[in-house]
């Protein structure tokens, strides 16, 4: 057999497999997904597979299988293992001699990530119809399948029968895509694949290829022997309704935020600076992975930093007036935020080329922020050189403005549906930080960010350049108020009140009825943040066997080798009693139990040593003090600063001052005194944690204190004597010893003076900062003497701490035993004292701290950071779940009050989330005297130090369960239990649960998320229970009738005829998915699928209505045609229900109650936008999502059935396009020029616009027969600009007729045989559909004229024998040839164009003869030349004559009387609206600056037409693909013609297909179809603070010409507007810009123009122009201010065949050219002279004379022909 020896041993064991020859074939059509059938007659989901004829790509004869088969059976094709003959060759011998490793055999593409023996490696499929003609020894598969699995043609494969069909079903399938893909499209794609087989690497499509994706992996959860489901990768699988689809975008908008802070410029442990890790490590690897995956992201890279300023520096800034952007944080520190955009919205093929520029900008950033910014301001103010100095200091990583950066990126995404880019999907935010993933943040900003992230369905990636810390990450710490006592809540009428623990993140003291509140430190583990650790050292490749230290002692590590007097180090012997003597070998479970027991003894809030019958000392309440003072908490509580007090005070002073301390603190100090300890105020400088001691600066001990170190053992002995029951049989590190630290000793009568007492370990280390005791009952004011520049160790995200300044009296109880310190005593006692330095972030518990000062450390802010705002929330705070937070000082209270020790029951974990406690101890280790109640577990009793768990199950239901389960989770980051971690993942991450089938490891980089961000999953399993829904939600119900109005357009007619209710339900689900809803399904791991999940009962109106969830989600319900579909999104839950008896759909909605403040956060800072030359001021508003009325779903549902047709109340997608001249020559092609016609460039521009409109007319939605059809899109041609054309009454009447419709003929006549006179008579009848009016064109006025398009349309609508456009054109040409009509200038034959005007020839125009005598047949607009107006005046160049873009507002006297426009309508004699030769200019001057007539209203003029487009006329999609088109009506071909498309959840690829078609057609005629922003570029900073238009100033202001208006009128320049004439000329005549939108104030003041695609009240501050390439937009500010420039990001960042680099460079070159010209005063002066019109000549004839002369000459040339009865 070819390819090796065939091993058929496996094939003979049973009859469930067979060997067949495999043949490949190439399918004619891709059967995968919906693309198998290009036309979808129905939008209803098909069954997974018909039992009779399931779809299959495998062709096989049933006779080839040795068992009975039927359609739908599951089979698998596998390769047969072939053993290759082991014949040694010369090459293998040489290879073995050289010691080279054999090359790894490359596996087939579908099997690359499938572990051999641990996943399915074959191709599974469902058996289709029998193929009796196929060979019984063959099986045929598509060639793509054979390539993916390595099947070779004409080789045997093994075909297996699969008995367990469930084992072939895929649980998860991940797709990659590179286009804009809506969530509804994802859902439809998944449903279209149900019942089909997919394999890894397969490409699937929907809607005829409009939606395309590729399978990345297939996973199925398989249960192991212990019953735990473990995900395993499959090479293929069958899609079912239960399959969860994961979509990752390779074309997203990516934001890379790189944090600049103190650590950025420092070295890590491996000798590499963190800034180098970014530019030489992380970014190159990221870009390489992007290239490998073929991504096409649009990338923005931003550097962000926060600079702190001391008080003296603030005074310096105030002195020089530089405090504009100065702010204060919650701790009272002064700071400024800096953001610099390094790369802005760029798409590149090779991102490696950007690294040098990024590196240069990073290297310059330190000087730019700390010096250059203020230096530029000082130089501008003329400051002396000696006054210039560097001010500010980098913040540490944990103090960074990371939330501000995230919110700034979210601001433009708030309206992601506006200016929709049709080539990308999703937003990825990545923050690269040298920290460890912990950030100290403001509570309100954290809450706001959480709400916004959940609302958008997004996540953020933190990439930390350090090694993973020993605490949980990501971690946000904040300060919050909390109630001191339990909050009572009535569970029902007459029910017993229960205590409630509020979620502190959502607790606002000023909105609560609770008055007795305090401050507390909280730690939150955000579910919307994913953390990766890029701790790669490039000169030390990663090795699995390399030991990596996780915890280092900085002070000892930094001691030199000579300092280590190792000979004096003596390790005490172990006590025999301390050695455990197990009676049997310990199992793994035993060891784990011992470790957990040990950890519980450390982290439990109550001592486990208090037993029944113990001594009063044993049973005394645990007086637990906080581990140290939190700098942030102190800042919140500090009310005043007082003078410092001496560290050594008389004992009486200590006792006297104990009343000013909190009860716990006072008790602790009293305990220390009574035990003979010297009570020393704790240093505010943080200390290393016993769990994670970080590096600190070297400090020395004073000789006095070092001599006291010897007393440690004496203190230990005394403690042993005082508390024998506690310390008996204790051993170093044992649970008993550790638990002793949480069972403090009650106060005893004082027996010695302070000075005589032996020193406790608290005195054995120096105090590196002085502490000032404040008499304030609420706080102490702490001041540290700090160096100007703190030194930091590697890997620090927070400041480093001093060494532990307190040790346990017994060596085994301290982190550093006395024998270690004694060994360093010579060194420490001789070194100089050092100052306090900021401590690195440590994680420790406050509620397990001992009574002395052996406590973990916390970040210690600088001097300026410790001045905080006075506490407004009441007395002093108590710490809560506070790793690495200091305990606030307590309010005045007696130092000790006995209390009863109560026992805590084992608690149960729940899905609700409260501020997490430290893990409660097991029941067996808790006191047995009594049961600890909920209050005791939730709050620490004042003065008693009892640990209070915030996980009480009876309180969880009262907490805002949904709020936390979808947003917020507090946690003890030092010791989170496995169950807690699961709760965190399941709570806030429930919306993202089905994105990660496998649990990821945080110590690795999450490359899949960084390469291709995942979209929000389509399904979730979160649903609140009845109690939660009653307490947390408001509910309501409405119904949607299942019938369709005539105006509906969201349901296809064929689907409505098949099953209207089903079609409406599917569309309602589809629209909600597009708005970020998720379908709620049964939990994936539900062990009893047949058991219904409890639903919120209050929604059940009828007992016989099924409301249970289904595992298959919406697809399963739609197939059944009955039941309910549950959906959720952020704050909303909807249930859509088929009514069992009525033709209607019942919608139950639930909206979360908002009980917290929702005020917006105002931010200000300094930004350096791309293209600018320095930092500039910026501000932004961070707003909460609007929960109550963000989307009107009632309106949306009734829009589906046609009861409503307005999009306004909804969140709909929109994008704007403009049609502009491209400046290129038209593409020559057959049919471009009509025969015997010579069209100029302007004529081709008009023709191109007409062709575009005709194409759009073919996309108009065809309504069902018997209903009115939509009118065709038309253009009313003009050569005026928008602000001028509104003064042309005839034009405005034509506009109104087009918008509101016009009458058409009755089509009862026949044209054949009719005389010319009869045709002329019909043409002149009023209201017959043919508009004959006076028209302005190119400075001339044509009376009694009509255009060719209107005549052709009139012939079609009037005569029954004129059918079709071609027939009408033939008849119109015949009328022209027979002398009935002619072109107004006799330069063209008949062409049905909108811009070519015709008139009746004499004598057929007798009905208008009186008008011709009165108005004149052809009038010059201003008749400035005696030769008439057949051509422009000689003084007007061709460019000037053709450029009506160059106009300006008239300079009118405000006091001039206002002239109202003539509002007469059609139907009157045309002479009634006659205007004299200069009427437009005169009217404009009168009304432009005037006010509307008193008592009157502005005249509203609608300028747009609205139509419904069918984007899928060929029915490729399975649903109605419609969009609303808004288009201009009046158009000047030299200006931009505007389109705006609005839609609700359509397949974007069909929109892109239409755009490409219109773009290609436009280019043929010298036009360009360009996508542009909806709003003006001047408003860009309102949405995005770090983007702004670039100002381009004029070096020379335009000259002031008093008679400029007269000169412009003399050259027939519009209405003679003179304002900004020179600026407009620069743009249009010099640099090829085209007028896009005119400024609002250029329109007459008594006219209000209305555009249906603009919001009411939206005004354009300045006129906006677009470059003919579409790459740039410019607004004209005027004067020396010049212009505002902005690249058109929608064009610059769009994908192109040639790449995007050339577009970016081209846009920059255009801007550079304009900047250079505007900065050259000499060139400007010369240009002003060139474009200035000459003054009018004195010998000109008057307008009347000129017109009479012209008319006489024209009459001589045109003699009326005798009227004849010519028949047609």
Curated annotation (Swiss-Prot):
Gene: IML1
Keyword Ion transport set for record: no
Ranges of Low complexity composition bias in the record: 688-703, 756-779, 879-894
GO molecular function, one term: GTPase activator activity
CDD domains attached to this UniProt entry: DEP_DEPDC5-like (cd04449)
Protein name: Vacuolar membrane-associated protein IML1
Family matches, as PROSITE patterns: DEP
GO biological process: intracellular signal transduction; negative regulation of TORC1 signaling; positive regulation of autophagy
Region (Disordered): 86-105, 637-816, 847-934, 1419-1439, 1457-1476, 1729-1768
